[in-house]
């Protein structure tokens, strides 16, 4: 929280100050998510999947061999009844819970910057909501937490634009009102193409560096807010 405080942001609710919507740390809320996932299963908005990693990988490779984008084929939705799923779970068989994305129609959302965005449902995958270890995936936990915490506005990077239609399908399946979205572009920087492992420049056939424009990221050695403070930069300048 130190970085947020340094920017001058002050919050009246959270892990360090408490409030009516706690707990605020996801691992302390882990018992909530399976309950909501099973609510979706009962409503038909999700289903239990017993496919092994090997089966999924074989299907993925088969799709790649055909030049197709892999999507889970809903095999467990069509072949495993809810009663059978509950028996197999009671017997200790590993499983995940997947979102049951419609195969027809549109999924859409409204963004304050990009306006109305919609995609064909048949292009979306049945993403995992609850993993085999019982923990929620990031996307599912976000939807549940935002609803329970009465979040009115969701502001995040454009890398989450492609996830928003599936978020709204979850809101619809639950019968919840979705938040107002604002997807903002990341901070970009002029750089050169580098190797992901060594972080060294990748040269072209003439031995020259290859200029690119990329997202500012610590993964590539760019300084963080705290790094800049330690180097003596004033926070007022960084905030600009």
Give each language-model segment a name.
Residues 8-13, 29-37:
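A conserved beta-strand/loop capping segment in the N-terminal third of enzymes
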Residues 20-29, 155-157:
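Conserved short loop/turn motifs at secondary-structure junctions
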Residues 217-240:
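A conserved active-site cap/scaffold subdomain adjacent to cofactor or substrate pockets
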